[in-house]
Curated annotation (Swiss-Prot):
Family: Belongs to the thymidine/pyrimidine-nucleoside phosphorylase family.
HAMAP family for this protein: Thymid_phosp
UniProt-listed InterPro entries: Glycosyl_Trfase_fam3 (IPR000312), Glycosyl_Trfase_fam3_N_dom (IPR017459), Glycosyl_Trfase_fam3_N_dom_sf (IPR036320), Nuc_phospho_transferase (IPR035902), PYNP-like_C_sf (IPR036566), PYNP_C (IPR013102), Pyrmidine_PPas_bac/euk (IPR018090), Pyrmidine_PPase_CS (IPR017872)
PANTHER family: THYMIDINE PHOSPHORYLASE
Keyword Cell division listed: no
Pathway(s) where this gene product acts: Pyrimidine metabolism; dTMP biosynthesis via salvage pathway; dTMP from thymine: step 1/2
Protein name per the record: Thymidine phosphorylase
GO CC field: cytosol
GO biological process, one term: pyrimidine nucleobase metabolic process
Highest taxon listed in the record's lineage: Bacteria
Length: 443
């Protein structure tokens, strides 16, 4: 038996906590035996004094075990349970293609995703643009779709990781969100509660990323890789570029359209293709579905080219309540804005740099993102045909096309887009889509 205040005192004094002490405190978060003030004090003590790797693993597994841990044993799946998670960005539509692609290669992908907040879009918000799609199905339906289709992308259910829900809301209000130890536990407890065999982690870097610097992103990637592997889940983190919009668009319905165009081969943005393939190939390698990257990429290209991945996306949508002909007739179902109009730069030259965060916030001002949790969204609005860094820009080349519901909203977004995309006299140096892979062997 421990006292919460003694655990806080120990961490305040910079000492390491035992797994039993961490387990006790997390249990108290879940049962309300630990007060809000004590949780806030604990968060601040960790923020200033940090945790060693053993403490991080203990915190992550205690939070994972605070609620239901999914069990796939009874379903008799004939392949690995694999997933990916992203720290979030702008135009990050990867999950919509990656899930069906991995399933088409023999994996099972029970992806529990989140909603957008601030400048980053949320995977669930994109699916909410699809009429009838249930982002909060019963656990029976979730398991049925995972088994029969190979992938189901849904929202977090109430009985998964309740400790994180309470802890995170208090961290958000007490300025302790930025702790690497606490971020690691928050992200991984949710993913590990899905009982995965393998996880590919997408840690964004740049002006649209969650972490402020490359160094901070790398530190988070290393922490996640070490803790996840320490907790028994094979994990690799990729550091990927978010200094520009990842897809050619940002929003909800517009990103669903781009995902379907990608799966069917109608259009594949080269940057989006590279990051999607990198993450998906890593999932296949970790899950034992390919023996090297060349083989993994060949398998993924095959399921894209033969239509299998697109077919699986369609089956997932219909299995979770969406239209059966969604892939073939998506334009019939996706909402469309009143105003769809290009925006032009005031100067000519090259797209030199982008404040990706500001472009994400432009989508929020259009009504496509949240200023606070619970805000209603307009799924039709957003940006399309966003230029890529290095593109030649002149008076006849739009830097983006804005989808808005009113002239006032269009004008506000137009000003934001012009401010966020900087035109230079020369093209910038090309940066890689994937900066680094951080595998267990690299730690």
């Amino acid at each position: 038996m421990f006292l919460a205040q003694e655990i806080i005192r120990k961490k305040r004094n910079g000492l390491a906590l035992s797994p039993a002490e961490i387990q006790f405190f997390v249990q108290g978060i879940t049962t309300n035996a630990v007060s809000e003030g004590q949780i806030a004090a604990f968060g601040m003590a960790v923020y200033f004094n940090d945790m060693n790797m053993d403490e991080r693993i203990a915190l992550t597994t205690a939070m994972r075990d605070s609620g239901t841990v999914l069990n796939w044993q009874s379903l008799g799946l004939n392949g690995p349970v694999i997933d990916k998670h992203s720290t979030g960005g702008v135009g990050d539509v990867i999950s919509l293609m990656l899930g069906p692609m991995a399933a088409a290669c023999g994996g099972y992908v029970p992806m529990i995703s989140g909603r957008g907040l601030g400048h980053t879009g949320g995977t669930l918000d994109k699916f909410d643009a699809i009429p009838g799609y249930q982002t909060e199905p019963s656990s029976e339906l979730f398991r049925k779709v995972v088994k029969e289709v190979g992938v189901a992308i849904i929202g977090q259910t109430g009985d998964l990781v309740p400790a994180d829900k309470r802890f995170y809301s208090i961290r958000d209000n007490t300025a302790t969100v930025e702790s690497i130890s606490l971020i690691t536990a928050s992200i991984l407890s949710k993913k590990l509660a899905c009982n995965l065999d393998a996880l590919a982690m997408d840690v964004k870097v740049g002006s649209g990323a969650f972490m402020p610097t490359y160094e901070a992103s790398e530190e988070l990637a290393r922490s996640i890789t070490a803790v996840a592997n320490g907790a028994g889940t094979k994990t690799t983190a990729l550091l990927t570029d978010m200094n520009q919009v990842l897809a050619s668009c940002a929003g909800n319905a517009v990103e669903v359209k781009e995902a379907i165009d990608f799966l069917t081969g109608a259009y594949r943005n080269p940057r989006l293709y590279e990051v999607t393939m990198g993450l998906c190939a890593e999932m296949l390698l970790l899950g034992g579905l390919a023996s090297n990257e060349t083989e993994a990429r060949a398998k993924l290209n095959r399921v894209l080219d033969n239509g299998r991945a697109a077919e699986i996306f369609g089956k997932m949508v219909s299995g979770l309540g969406g239209p059966v002909d969604f892939v073939e007739n998506y334009s019939k179902y996706l909402p469309q804005s009143q105003i769809i109009r290009p925006v032009f730069a005031d100067a000519k030259g090259y797209a030199y740099s982008m404040d990706t965060r500001e472009l994400g916030l432009a989508v929020v001002t259009l009504g496509g993102g949240r200023r606070k949790p619970g805000d209603a969204l307009d799924y039709s609005v957003g940006l399309t045909q966003v230029c890529a860094l290095g593109d030649k820009i002149d008076s006849s080349t739009p830097i983006a096309v804005i989808h808005a519901q009113s002239e006032a909203a269009f004008t506000e977004a137009e000003n934001a887009v012009k401010k966020a995309i900087h035109i230079g006299e020369t093209a910038p140096e090309k940066t890689p889509e994937i900066y680094a892979y951080i595998r267990a062997a690299d730690l």
